[in-house]
From Swiss-Prot:
Annotated keywords: RNA-binding, tRNA-binding
GO molecular function per UniProt: protein homodimerization activity; tRNA binding
Domain of life per record: Bacteria
Taxon lineage: Bacteria, Pseudomonadati, Pseudomonadota, Gammaproteobacteria, Enterobacterales
Subunit structure: Homodimer.
Protein name per its UniProtKB record: tRNA-binding protein YgjH
Alphabetized CDD domains for the sequence: tRNA_bind_CsaA (cd02798)
Keyword RNA-binding carried by entry: yes
Amino acid sequence: METVAYADFARLEMRVGKIVEVKRHENADKLYIVQVDVGQKTLQTVTSLVPYYSEEELMGKTVVVLCNLQKAKMRGETSECMLLCAETDDGSESVLLTPERMMPAGVRVV
């Protein structure tokens, strides 16, 4: 396992987020376009959680979000952040990371 200096880890801005909008991507069977409230702003992510969660299960969910990921285009949509998940090696299961207790959107994860 490769080690990472604390200074590099500290550059990651992870925050508690609340999913405020979910819709299926029109041109991709396994993608959702998700709006996440991370406190001071709302970020959009394109995520491949369709096999694991329904839109109803995602809506309103409190999650852990990597906020300062470089923007990327996924099937024509901008993804500005990443929802953090635990995933099995074979990809058969993916579970969103959530705070143990309710925390407001925008709280920093350290």
